[in-house]
Amino acid sequence: SNSDYLLDGFPEILILSNDLKDGQPIGVVDAGVEWHSDLSWQLDPPLGSILHCLTTPTTGGRTGFLNMSAAYQLLPKSLQERLLSLEGSHCVSKLVNSRVTISENRVNAAAFYAEQLKKHPPVSHPMVYEHPDTGEKILFASPRFTIGIDGLYEEEGQSLLDEIFAYFDDETIRYDYSWSEGDIVMWDNRSVLHCALGGYQYPDIRLIHRT
């Protein structure tokens, strides 16, 4: 489990890395490869997230960010209005999300995600909320953790999510960050999605601490 990759003495820090020690990964290898907001599968997700880069690969390894206030503004007015009254269902287990794939690097993946589903059943969050500091309307949904829309039949909910997620390809709401060793990046987890963009392979190493 991810608890195997917490930094010694600092349990709030998770190690993200493809480096190996005695043939085993020292961190979560394929963390965050789908667009997501950290821990949105919890009832009270964190307000912010911080990444500290310790080792960068020679190629790739960037992190993408999406502005979810701008994403909401991209939607047609009719869709904006419809989403105001809906709640999305968020879940950490990949077993209930057809949009994601289970990494080959995850040991005993099926058992792990079955246990996660048992420990962390789906929770609901508004599809759109008003940011408490800026007053902006924020689209709060992601391909990684949003598995359905409450009150809609499965097919209708998935179709609506597909329509929303298609807007995530718009370059005007996206920024890709290229890391240098020692960089620290922090962001508002409530209004920004992020994902690891890959593009490197072992023995090219990426090592990042997340909290």
Ranges and model annotations:
Residues S1-M186, R190-T211:
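Fe(II)/2-oxoglutarate oxygenase catalytic core
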